[in-house]
Each structure stands twice: as C-alpha cells, then as structure tokens.
Amino acid sequence: MEFFVISLLNGLSYGLLLFLLSSGLTLIFSMMGVLNFAHASFYMLGAYVAYSIARWIGFWPGLVIAPLVVGVLGALFERICLRRVHRYGNVPELLITFGLAYLVLELVQLVWGRIAVEFKPPAMLLGPAFTLLHSPADGLSLVLGAAPAGLCDAAAGAARVLCSPFPATRAFMMFVAVLMLAVLWLLLTRTRIGLVIQSALTHPQMVEALGHDVPRVLMLVFGVGCALAGLAGVIGGSTFVTEPAMAAALGPVVFVVVVVGGMGSLAGAFLASLLIGVIQTFAVAVDASLLGLVEALGLAPGPQLAGNSLLQLKLSQVAPILPYLFLVLMLIFRPKGLLGTREG
C-alpha cells in the first residue's frame, strides 16, 4: 500500500512540475497564438540564474528573483524580435523561437559550462516531508518529517517496520504548482487586467479603441509565461539536476502535455500533466514485462517465445515513450485534446 501511495505522490509531483512549465506555454498560445519552441529554454535559464543567485544570497531570494529576470528577458524578446515577425504568420514565429532555443543553449554552455552544476535546495527542504510507516501490528501510519531513529531498522519478523519517506522538495514542488494554478485562475477571471487580456484575444480592435495598449498586454502575457517557465526551472533544477540538457529532456514532454490537454486550455494542461506524470511514474516503478504477464496467466511460453526480445522488454524501459504514444492516440481519436476547443 505504501508503494502505491508514494508512487502516486511522486507521479503527482512530477505532473505538477510539468503543469508549472506547460501553463506558461499554454497561456502564451491561448492569448497570442504563438507556439514558443524556446519555452523549455526559459525553464533551463531559470534554473541557472537561480543557481548563480543562490551562490551569493541564498535559495529563497533566487526563487523570487530568477523568474522575474527570466520574465523580463522573455518580454524583451517579444518586444524586440517576436513582434516584428508576428505579422508574417506562425512559421516565422516558430523559426525565430527555434533559433532562440539554440542560442540560449550555447550561451548557457559558454557561461556555466557543459557539465551539471551543483544546485542544491535549502537545508529545510533536504529531508523528508513525511514518512509512511507500515507495520504488521499497526498497519499504515504517517509521521511528519523523518521517522524516529532506529524504528526503520527493527529486526525482521513481526516487528519489522517498512518506512517510505516522501521528499520535502517534491512536496514543495506540489505546493508551488497548486499555488500558481490558483493565482493564474484568479488573475484571469477575477481581475481587471485578466479581463483585458482575455478580451485582447478575441476583440483586439475593441480593446485598443477603449484605450488599452494591446501590444503591451501581449508583451506582458509572454513575459508572464516565460516567468512561469523560469519558476519551474528553479524548482526542477534544485530538485533534479541543473545541466544544459535539461531543456531538451523536458521540452518535448511539455509540448505533448499542451497538445494532449488541448491547445490553449489551462484546465486541459493541468489534467494532461497529472495523467502523464502518474502514468510515467508508475511505469518506471513497476517491474513488469509481457513475458511476465504470460507466465502470470499460467501459460508456459516455449523457448523461442521466451527468448523474444520484445516480450522481455520491461515496462520501465518503454516508460520514456509513453507520453508520445499517448500523443499519437490523442491525435487519432480526439485531435482537439482532452478539454480543447481547437481541432488544429
């Protein structure tokens, strides 16, 4: 039972990190119609900027300052570069953001090097947020923080206690992602600037006639989307690894989340992030194969069948391709995504 609970929480935390990153891309696409190919590069940039700040004044100032720096850089890119090609359609926008992704990668390698940097979370996030205890006598219980010393090292037998800690970094990741979801929802539905942003999407001429600067609103949207990616980078970089390959590792999965959830749908991105995070985490955690399934059904595979390399593939080995399989199935059976309204 504790394996299921911890795996589920790990999947939810990974899914919420995906949402924190994909929410910025979804916001940019829904408001501007721009599919930012360099979005994961802002994620990487947030991690590296926070790493540099944390070395001088600590992690918590870096958590606040790095997303702001990345957001300003994103807004400047929209103002100086993206706005100039916007009138020519989607292909020039894709090409210029594609070029930006490689430019950011090369700059990161020039400034911080080609190997991973040691970006650690603060001391208060290094231990477990809580520990699940499972004993034959008391069943499943929960202890905040680490388990009492010596409890998990009890002798084998009836007194043995299984301890499954859940890292505080992942709990913090979940908290920040849910907080950002609430802030985005309140901003877009309960504030004046949110109403202006949504109106600028559907009736830009009317909004401009009312005295609002539509290009500045769109620049703000792009900057906020990049800042969300930077915030995800601070948390993801300190929790996992901060290296030049982190954008390439997570970027394709983020595009899968946006398409599966529905282009431009924040609710769809949230649902798709959780689904992909949980499915991929359980696939990595479960040690199973088609051959094992055949044997579990009581069938006796012959020597030729037992030696088949395809049947011997573990579920954990195919876990990295599951999001893309999900994407293909979604495009075949529901092209507009889970909660999307656009077919293409």
Model-predicted segments: where are they?
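Inter-helical junctions in multi-pass inner-membrane proteins, predominant
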Residues: 2-17, 184-192, 218-264, 281-292, ...
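Single transmembrane alpha-helix segments in multi-pass membrane proteins
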Residues: 3-52, 78-92, 205, 215, ...
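Membrane-embedded helix boundary and interhelical linker motif in transport proteins
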Residues: 9, 31-76, 80, 85, ...
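Helix-loop-helix "hairpin" substructures at the membrane interface of multi-pass membrane proteins
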Residues: 14, 149, 157-158, 165-243, ...
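Hydrophobic alpha-helical transmembrane segments of polytopic membrane proteins
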Residues: 20, 70-72, 252-277, 323-333, ...
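Hydrophobic alpha-helical transmembrane segments
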Residues: 41, 45, 60-68, 94-96, ...
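Alpha-helical transmembrane segments within multi-pass membrane transporters and channels
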Residues: 58-100, 107, 271-276, 280, ...
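Transmembrane helix-bundle core of multi-pass membrane transporters
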Residues: 84-85, 93-190, 286-320, 336, ...
